[in-house]
From Swiss-Prot:
Catalytic activity: XTP + H2O = XMP + diphosphate + H(+); dITP + H2O = dIMP + diphosphate + H(+); ITP + H2O = IMP + diphosphate + H(+)
This enzyme's EC code(s): 3.6.1.66
Residues annotated to bind Mg(2+): E36, D64
Cofactor binding remark: Binds 1 Mg(2+) ion per subunit.
Residues reported in the UniProt entry to bind substrate: T7, G8, N9, K10, H11, K12, A65, F140, A141, F142, D143, K163, H168, R169
Protein name listed in UniProt: dITP/XTP pyrophosphatase
Stored Gene3D superfamilies: 3.90.950.10
InterPro entries named among the record's database cross-references: dITP/XTP_pyrophosphatase, ITPase-like_fam, RdgB/HAM1
Membership in a protein family: Belongs to the HAM1 NTPase family.
Biological process (GO), any one: nucleotide metabolic process
């Protein structure tokens, strides 16, 4: 069965295509903007999926993700895209100067909705820490700052295949794929 991924982010699309490759889910793409509520990742994903399903008149997924840093009271959280666009990685590093507690989580919420149905949300989390400098040129956004638990390389130093083994987005998309293949006829 086809599902349309609503995103303007080519990196997210590439990650999703690789994850769905062997699932039987045919992923289509539409760069359709949708209003993002000022709320939790789950609320944004739920609303975005429902809104997009009505407009597209078909099953859709949306994804919202954020970097949550414990020492910064879980900032930037759901405001990660705005923070990335304004202060960027250098701004995060500046906020983290002389901070010992470097614990952070990347969280992802994948929202699914089909016309005339209630939206479903699937969560993925990966724990790690914020480095003291940017490392790596792969990935996007905060990837060069984030070191997954037990690794000495940042997300920015990992290939998409390596990152997809355990990233927050991969975990949320895999939960969705399992649910979707069990609840919808996959052709």
């Amino acid at each position: 069965m086809k599902v349309t991924f609503i995103t303007g982010n080519k990196h997210k699309l590439s990650e999703a295509e690789k994850i769905f490759h062997d699932t039987g889910i045919e992923l289509e793409h539409a760069d359709l903007g949708y209003p993002e509520l000022q709320g939790t990742l789950e609320e944004v994903a739920r609303y975005g999926a429902e809104h997009a399903a009505r407009i597209m008149d078909g099953p859709v997924i949306v994804e919202d993700a954020g970097l949550f840093i414990r020492a910064l009271k879980w900032f930037p959280g759901p405001y990660s895209a705005y923070v990335q666009d304004t202060i960027g990685n250098r701004g995060i590093l500046k906020l983290m100067e002389n901070v010992e507690d470097r614990y952070a989580e990347f969280r992802s919420a994948v929202g699914f909705c089909a016309p005339k149905s209630e939206p479903e949300v699937f969560l993925g989390v990966v724990k790690g820490r914020i480095g003291t400098e940017e490392r790596g040129t792969r990935g996007f956004a905060f990837d060069p700052l984030f070191y997954p638990e037990g690794m000495d390389r940042s997300f920015g130093e990992l290939s998409t295949i390596e990152k997809n083994r355990f990233s927050h987005r991969s975990r949320a998309l895999k939960k969705f794929a399992q649910w979707y293949t069990e609840n919808y006829e996959v052709i």
